[in-house]
């Protein structure tokens, strides 16, 4: 049952990110790599305004579907915003931050 819920959550998040025009969406199954979450999603926004908008609208859209976030970090600067849904953590980044931190190398 947990895997089914997890897959539904990942699918919902990806669909919303796509609707919000996030680009370069990557999904990583990190079960066994950390004790924090099961999946990491990374996507890119075109500007700080776009990154902040993606993160805020993602949380709002998920809430409308009955999916509550545990919170978000980085909204003030919006270079890199993290939205925590428990089993899925979403990283919304500007391209410069994504290039600098290279999270794909960490989890890929």
Name each region found by the language model.
Residues 1-39, 43-108:
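Positively charged, small/polar-rich N-terminal and surface patches that mediate targeting and assembly
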């Amino acid at each position: 049952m947990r895997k089914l819920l997890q897959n539904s959550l990942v699918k919902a998040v990806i669909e919303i990110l796509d609707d919000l025009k996030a680009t370069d969406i990557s999904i990583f199954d990190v079960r066994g790599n950390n004790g924090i979450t099961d999946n990491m999603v990374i996507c890119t926004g075109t500007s700080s305004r776009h990154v902040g908008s993606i993160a805020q609208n993602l949380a709002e859209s998920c809430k409308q579907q009955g999916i509550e976030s545990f919170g978000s970090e980085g909204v003030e600067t919006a270079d890199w915003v993290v939205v925590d849904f428990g089993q899925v953590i979403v990283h919304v980044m500007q391209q410069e931050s994504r290039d600098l931190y290279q999270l794909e190398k960490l989890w890929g």
